[in-house]
Amino acid sequence: MNKSMKILIFGSKGWLGQKFKSFLSKLDVLFAEAQTRIDIENKNNIIREIKEISPTHVISFIGRTHGFIGDKEYKTIDYLEEDGKLVENMRDNFLAPILLYEILKNTDIHYTYIGTGCIFEYKEDIKKVQDEPENCYKFLEEDKPNFYGSSYSIVKGYTDQYLKDTLNILNVRIRMPITEYNEPQNFITKITKYEKICSVPNSISVIPELLPYIFELMKKKYSGTINMVNPGVISHNEILKMYQEIVDPKFTWKNFTLEEQADVLS
């Protein structure tokens, strides 16, 4: 058992939290799963749990991207666009990670926040990537969010800016997470279920490949923001073409334009 680190995981029952637990178990790293819900009313209980466990590191996978309304399940961030969901969005996507920061900021405990890269939108003045497709542009760690097309992205953008330059925090941006399994949260699985696809070059995060890097940065107590994505870009159509070739030769899909997508979302 590696006793040089003791990691307390918030959001351990979520998709990425479970992936991280499995990864740590294989490394024989000591970790604990937080039992207290991150809520301002639970602040004293959170502090008590942290003191009892006495971790060297805290990592948060807390976030809200889906949920139920009545008997209907919303599996995407469309859930947060429904009436009455702003409070839930603010609670889980802004207040929870900020509350953890406020609790930990005067301690020696390193804090890793798993955030998102879904806070950026292509603009003509964004820096071009060398040797990449003509319509591909690069966002850097110091760039500020510029996408306000969803309630989720707006709230996450403010969280990102609040935490990005704070001491003793690793702010990790992931984008379109992919794994090797057919599971609902896998980006590949998601887009195979869509009726139409708006295909644009984008960054992706292949989770099994990137978890070791997150862990190494945690171990070194790295502070700052990192765009935790794989090199280069790939379009939705390229992903689906590989899915068709490797998984299901009978699979087909339809495209629509950004303008048509905007009409649907408006």
What do these predicted regions represent?
Residues 5-26:
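N-terminal Rossmann NAD(P)H-binding glycine-rich loop of SDR-like oxidoreductase domains
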Residues 10, 61-62, 111-117, 123, ...:
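SDR active-site strand-loop-helix element
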Residues 151-154, 176-219, 224:
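Substrate-positioning beta->alpha
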Residues 82-96, 118-172, 179:
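Catalytic helix-loop patch of NAD(P)-dependent Rossmann-fold dehydrogenases
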Residues 29-41, 253-258:
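A short beta-strand-loop structural module common to alpha/beta enzyme folds
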Residues 42, 92-99, 110, 158-159, ...:
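Conserved cofactor-binding/catalytic machinery of classical short-chain dehydrogenase/reductase
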Residues 40-93:
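NAD(P)H-binding glycine-rich loop region in Rossmannoid oxidoreductase-like domains
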Residues 213-265:
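Mid/C-terminal beta-alpha module of Rossmann-like enzyme folds, strongest
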